[in-house]
Amino acid sequence: MGRRCCRRRVLAAACLGAALLLLCAAPRSLRPAFGNRALGSSWLGGEKRSPLQKLYDLDQDPRSTLAKVHRQRRDLLNSACSRHSRRQRLLQPEDLRHVLVDDAHGLLYCYVPKVACTNWKRVLLALSGQARGDPRAISAQEAHAPGRLPSLADFSPAEINRRLRAYLAFLFVREPFERLASAYRNKLARPYSAAFQRRYGARIVQRLRPRALPDARARGHDVRFAEFLAYLLDPRTRREEPFNEHWERAHALCHPCRLRYDVVGKFETLAEDAAFVLGLAGASDLSFPGPPRPRGAAASRDLAARLFRDISPFYQRRLFDLYKMDFLLFNYSAPSYLRLL
């Protein structure tokens, strides 16, 4: 009986692996992919044109400036993946945990923390009819509550592949070091993140500041930016557990070289790109929530430049190498404030 159960488990694992292998083979580039994709025929939203069909129509229209921008981003991503990605392990369902599903509108959204993901979760909840369709009425706590939005990892391999074929998949990215600076400021340098600081800040202080005061070792409330970077670069960090999602690389969260993304939005052009996605979803009347106060790209860049100013060129280079794939895949140049060796 024991051997028979073991064989069944091995067979089930093999079937799951084979199904996910199909998932990994999904084409990255939009235009070649249309010939092999259902274009909404298996979409769960009904007879109206799916967001993927609308994007296909725009892709054929030379007058659509935004469609051209997103086509270029897809092509650049596809080219960078071909040049720089290595053979990787098979994707497991848990790898799809960051891909959220909106069956009613035919959307797959891979969220990257510190790239407007709270507001995108608000929007998806509003699209589902919660808070009477007003994303601004949804608190950040509600938006991040577990189970409020289904993840692609919650479905069977067959259901995963069906959605990958028929739905519009999108993600939003940000200049990697500006995202890192934002994560440090909001999670380790602000007083309202006490629980996060006790978990990660205390660990950083205990490892990197041997003579720290007991209060700092317990609370982790005064982590310096240089200590945070040293923690990221320490090989022990990733041996102990995966990076926290707030500083994990975007490509490691969303696997853009193995999953096909139709729209690559950018934090730097957030308003335009968000409106483009909402238009494809048939929700142009829904306003994407803006930040509580005006923050331009210059403010984000200035914060990163100020924090990196006192970091040595040696550590700047090591950190750039750690996040290099995000720079390459999403077409970001090395920041001008870096002094790379």
From Swiss-Prot:
Superkingdom as given in the UniProt entry: Eukaryota
Known EC number: 2.8.2.5
Regions of this protein lying in the Lumenal compartment: 31-341
GO aspect biological process, one term: chondroitin sulfate proteoglycan biosynthetic process
Transmembrane segments: 10-30
InterPro entries noted in UniProt: Carb_sulfotrans_8-10, Sulfotransferase
UniProt subcellular location: Golgi apparatus membrane
Keyword Hydrolase carried by entry: no
Membrane recorded as keyword: yes
Residues linked to a glycan: 331
Membrane topology qualifier: Single-pass type II membrane protein
Any single GO CC term annotated in Swiss-Prot or TrEMBL for this entry: Golgi membrane
Modified sites of kind Phosphoserine: 139
Cytoplasmic side: 1-9
Principal location: Golgi
A molecular function (GO) term: chondroitin 4-sulfotransferase activity
Reaction catalyzed: chondroitin beta-D-glucuronate + n 3'-phosphoadenylyl sulfate = chondroitin 4'-sulfate + n adenosine 3',5'-bisphosphate + n H(+)
Residue numbers binding 3'-phosphoadenylyl sulfate: 113-119, 174-182
Function: Catalyzes the transfer of sulfate to position 4 of the N-acetylgalactosamine (GalNAc) residue of chondroitin. Chondroitin sulfate constitutes the predominant proteoglycan present in cartilage and is distributed on the surfaces of many cells and extracellular matrices. No activity toward dermatan.
Family: Belongs to the sulfotransferase 2 family.
The protein, known as: Carbohydrate sulfotransferase 13
